[in-house]
Curated annotation (Swiss-Prot):
Its main location: secreted. One of its GO terms (molecular function) is toxin activity. It comes from the Eukaryota. Expressed by the venom gland. SUPFAM superfamilies: Insect pheromone/odorant-binding proteins (SSF47565). This is U-scoloptoxin(17)-Er1a. Belongs to the scoloptoxin-17 family. It is found in: Secreted. Keywords: Disulfide bond, Secreted, Signal, Toxin.
Length: 130
């Protein structure tokens, strides 16, 4: 019995340590969901940072996360994030809601605000396509 309890304790510790690296989002999983649309927009062949940025915007538009007016659709973004969040889901969603209370806001400003709010909670997360 003691051995079983110890084994369970070790598993809990390992899971805690695995998520204690500052990461809140399983970025490989999220990017795997988004990458095809971003690649269709020419990300891999983009010669400049601006061209890469434009390809990401185009991909997010294809997915319905960003409108043609370059506004973030918060609920659609949450839907994409949902099964990729490892920890702090409430904090992540609250940050999105605080940065865009209307549900549709300028994407660049909203993402900047969002990342500033979650940086201390999720310092290990970086959102950049491969």
């Amino acid at each position: 019995m003691k051995l079983l309890v110890f084994a369970l304790f070790l598993q809990v510790v390992q899971l805690s340590l695995a998520q204690d690296d500052g990461k809140c989002i399983d970025m490989p999983k999220l990017l795997k969901k988004m990458q095809p649309a971003i690649d269709e927009c020419g990300y891999k062949d983009a010669p400049t940072d601006q061209a890469k940025h434009d390809a990401v915007t185009c991909g997010l538009q294809k997915l319905g996360i960003v409108t043609q007016n370059k506004e973030l659709v918060v609920q659609t973004y949450k839907d994409y994030l949902d099964d990729t969040i490892l920890q702090h889901k409430t904090e992540l969603y609250n940050a999105l809601d605080e940065c865009c209370p209307s549900g549709t806001c300028p994407a660049q400003d909203t993402f900047k605000c969002y990342h500033e709010k979650i940086d201390s909670v999720c310092p290990g997360d970086k959102q950049k396509p491969q």
